[in-house]
């Protein structure tokens, strides 16, 4: 398959890239600071540019995979309206735009795989923006799946990565971590499988 991978230079994106490429897929990487295409999906015009340039390089895409989406982590009292808006733009609207524009750009039975996270169902202190964004992404996936068939859309919702415990483990006390390889396998399930409207929780 020809796959557009957003957020390819981060820890998760690199793991997803390695796994999908190892299975014989042709990957076009997108990142803000690296990759085949250097673009920011929080800007709808740059999403359009990503699709245009990907089509020039590879023709019709079979799948779009997102491993990107930043949200701020602060207590509610320390958050500003712009903090919440930035988190929503960065993780929700950017990924929605990938699907909204992408339905006319990918194969008729192609797929989208978005990124969400554990905080939508198991919130942590300072994580209200992430919980908001993740919940919105998951609700969008379930609803959009009804509209875009036979194209498919799913999300992957991991907990904290084993490889990131040193940096983030204190924010997730008692939460079982998940290896990046397991998360990448959930992306494979979405890309190569037949389900739609699902949120895969790697374990």
Name every feature range the model reports, one short phrase each:
Residues 150-151, 155-203:
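C-terminal helical subdomain
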Residues 31-47:
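Rossmann-fold cofactor-recognition segment
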Residues 75-76, 83-85:
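Substrate-binding pocket helix/loop in short-chain dehydrogenase/reductase
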Residues 46-49, 93-101:
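Conserved mid-core alpha-helix of short-chain dehydrogenase/reductase
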Residues 42-60:
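Conserved Rossmann-fold cofactor-binding substructure of NAD(P)-dependent oxidoreductases
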Residues 5-19:
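N-terminal Rossmann NAD(P)H-binding glycine-rich loop of SDR-like oxidoreductase domains
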Residues 86-90, 94-97, 109-137, 141-149, ...:
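Catalytic loop of short-chain dehydrogenase/reductase
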Residues 65-73:
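Conserved NAD(P)H cofactor-binding loop of Rossmann-fold oxidoreductase domains
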């Amino acid at each position: 398959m020809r796959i557009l991978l957003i957020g390819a230079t981060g820890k998760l994106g690199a793991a997803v890239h390695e796994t999908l490429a190892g299975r014989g897929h042709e990957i076009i990487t997108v990142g803000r600071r690296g990759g085949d295409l250097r673009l920011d999906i929080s800007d709808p015009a740059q999403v359009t540019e990503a699709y245009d340039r990907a089509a020039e390089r590879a023709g019709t895409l079979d799948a779009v995979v997102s491993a990107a989406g930043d949200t701020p982590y602060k207590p509610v009292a320390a958050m500003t309206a712009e903090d919440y808006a930035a988190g929503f733009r960065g993780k929700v609207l950017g990924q929605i735009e990938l699907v909204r524009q992408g339905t006319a750009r990918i194969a008729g039975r192609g797929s989208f795989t978005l990124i969400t996270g554990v905080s939508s169902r198991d919130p942590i202190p300072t994580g209200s923006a992430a919980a908001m964004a993740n919940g919105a992404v998951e609700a969008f996936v379930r609803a959009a799946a009804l509209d875009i068939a036979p194209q498919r859309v799913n999300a992957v919702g991991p907990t904290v990565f084993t490889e990131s415990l040193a940096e983030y483990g204190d924010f997730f006390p008692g939460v079982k971590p998940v290896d990046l390889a397991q998360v990448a396998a959930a992306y494979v399930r979405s890309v190569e499988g037949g389900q739609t409207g699902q949120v895969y929780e790697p374990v």
